[in-house]
Amino acid sequence: MSITTHLDIVSAEHEIFSGVVELVVATGELGEIGITPGHAPLLTVLRPGEVRITLQGGTQDIYYVQGGMLEVQPHCVTILADVAERAEHLDEAAALAAKAKAEAAIASKGGDIDYSVAAAELARAVAQIRAIQKTRKKMK
């Protein structure tokens, strides 16, 4: 039997995942962070990106979060996400369209463009596309 910890992934709408895991990997403000059982207590901001979890037994699942907070306690990890969903439920066509729209907004020379908003939209779209691609690789 492997060493595990409890994980909850919760969005504003509902609980996405609750269960026992061996590993959690998420995109924090300073880069990727891996949480294993017994990790030191931690509170960090999450950036838009994937959350990879390794379930008891070695199966991996991939989720997409659009930012939020990650809290680590001695026997529990909690992700409070602004938006969260399973990566396989993401709409690839919509993510590609959002990426193209954000890139066009950044490339335009118009004065009415809010570049920080366009950059945030681009980051979200790219994160969704990466999560979709990793899910596709996992299924092969």
UniProtKB/Swiss-Prot annotation:
Compartment list: Cell inner membrane
Topology relative to the membrane: Peripheral membrane protein
One of the Pfam families matching this protein, by short name: ATP-synt_DE_N
Record SUPFAM superfamilies: Epsilon subunit of F1F0-ATP synthase C-terminal domain, Epsilon subunit of F1F0-ATP synthase N-terminal domain
Record's keyword terms, sorted: ATP synthesis, Cell inner membrane, Cell membrane, CF(1), Hydrogen ion transport, Ion transport, Membrane, Transport
Domain of life: Bacteria
Coiled coil (residue ranges): none
Primary localisation category: membrane
Tagged with keyword Disulfide bond: no
InterPro entries recorded: ATP_F1_dsu/esu_C_sf (IPR036794), ATP_synth_F1_dsu/esu (IPR001469), ATP_synth_F1_dsu/esu_N (IPR020546), ATP_synth_F1_esu_C (IPR020547), ATPsynth_dsu/esu_N (IPR036771)
Gene Ontology terms for molecular function: ATP binding; proton-transporting ATP synthase activity, rotational mechanism
Gene Ontology CC: plasma membrane; proton-transporting ATP synthase complex
The protein's role, per its UniProt record: Produces ATP from ADP in the presence of a proton gradient across the membrane.
Subunit comment: F-type ATPases have 2 components, CF(1) - the catalytic core - and CF(0) - the membrane proton channel. CF(1) has five subunits: alpha(3), beta(3), gamma(1), delta(1), epsilon(1). CF(0) has three main subunits: a, b and c.
Family assignment from sequence similarity: Belongs to the ATPase epsilon chain family.
PANTHER family linked: ATP SYNTHASE DELTA/EPSILON CHAIN, ATP SYNTHASE EPSILON CHAIN, CHLOROPLASTIC
Protein name in the entry: ATP synthase epsilon chain
Gene symbol of the encoding locus: atpC
